[in-house]
């Protein structure tokens, strides 16, 4: 109770800000106002446990980083191995995408490519054709070993994702 009181007092003073139950951050001041923490920090407990990845940011936030869209979103999608109910984290709404493959640091970039193909129609502010071209550009930059791994990971995805990946790989040679 004493710790809770102290934290509540610091939040009231404005020294720290609360993200979620038991999660706080110290806001940085700039000439443009208060900076919020990076998205990965807001959901860090959902992405890592004991230094091992248990989830990864996917959806619009990740697709913007990959250059597939220019939209910035307040909805975070996290790929995890088990189903979880959607939740709110500060001003973000967090939803979960069940990922049948093992989540490792090496797999995450490949899983993002497959998720982009899976969620092709849901990527905002861009056409599916542009997305396919963007994903093809990402796939073209992969090494031979990564291409084999990508094909293995695709086995657990829907048939249309495997078909689209096959068509892209065919077009790349």
Could you describe each region identified by the protein language model?
Residues 99-173:
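Hydrophobic alpha-helical interaction segments
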Residues 88-90, 94-98:
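A short, charged helix-loop
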Residues 46, 50, 66, 116-120:
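Generic structural signal for hydrophobic core residues of well-folded globular domains
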Residues 3, 58-59, 109:
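Amphipathic alpha-helical interface surfaces
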Residues 44-47, 58-61, 120-126:
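Positively charged, aromatic-accented nucleic-acid-binding surfaces
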Residues 1-48:
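Short beta-edge/loop segments at beta->alpha junctions of small alpha/beta modules
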